[in-house]
Swiss-Prot record:
A double ring-shaped homohexamer of HslV is capped on each side by a ring-shaped HslU homohexamer. The assembly of the HslU/HslV complex is dependent on binding of ATP. One of its GO terms (cellular component) is proteasome core complex. PANTHER family: ATP-DEPENDENT PROTEASE SUBUNIT HSLV, METALLOPROTEASE TLDD. CDD domains: protease_HslV. PROSITE patterns: PROTEASOME_BETA_2. It is found in: Cytoplasm. This is ATP-dependent protease subunit HslV. It is an enzyme of class 3 (hydrolase).
Length: 180
């Protein structure tokens, strides 16, 4: 498990949201409280976040962004191509990072072994040391509250930040809304 962060992605009825905390840890020490581990890609039509080694994650972001561009913004194709590249490249197979990527149609977890996983419910995914806390909170809030998508992500990450020592409550979110 990566003791680095918590990233939560939620694909709701009207919006897709990704959120992450701001803590950067090195061993038992907090190095930074306001890091941004999420990004907008493809002119804001795709959202992505990472957990794990920061240097490795930036390499993965760059590679994924190139594949997304070459696939003309097709997230599914880019995710599959990403997995193929990851498995072919010996250097990439040693990277210690995971990513979540989503648009209004899909949400994928890209694992450190090159796997591409779409969550069973197709709506909620989380990674990082606080990922299971955030995922549990998001599932409960999605089922038992009337929170909008962005507030659901924020509240879920808040809960994870209160439980996981590698996650803080300095939360950043990005949103994709349906075209009106």
């Amino acid at each position: 498990m990566f003791h680095a962060t918590t990233i939560l992605a939620y694909k709701g009825k009207n919006k897709s949201v990704i959120g992450g905390d701001g803590q950067v840890s090195f061993g038992n020490t907090v190095l930074k409280n306001n890091a941004v581990k999420i990004r907008k890609l493809n002119n804001g039509k795709v959202l992505a976040g990472f957990a794990g080694s920061t240097a490795d994650a930036f390499n993965l972001f760059d590679m994924f962004e190139k594949l997304l561009s070459s696939s003309k913004g097709d997230l599914l194709k880019a995710a599959i191509d990403f997995s193929k590249e990851w498995r072919k490249d010996k250097y990439l197979r040693k990277l210690e990072a995971m990513m979540l990527v989503l648009d209004r149609n899909h949400i994928f977890l890209l694992s450190g072994t090159g796997d591409v996983v779409e969550p069973e419910d197709g709506a909620i995914a989380a990674i990082g040391s606080g990922g299971n806390y955030a995922l549990s909170a998001a599932r409960a809030l999605a089922k038992h509250s009337n929170l909008d998508e962005e507030n659901l992500v924020k509240e879920s990450l808040q809960i994870a930040g209160e439980i996981c020592i590698y996650t803080n409550t300095n939360i950043k979110t990005y949103v994709i809304e349906d075209d009106k």
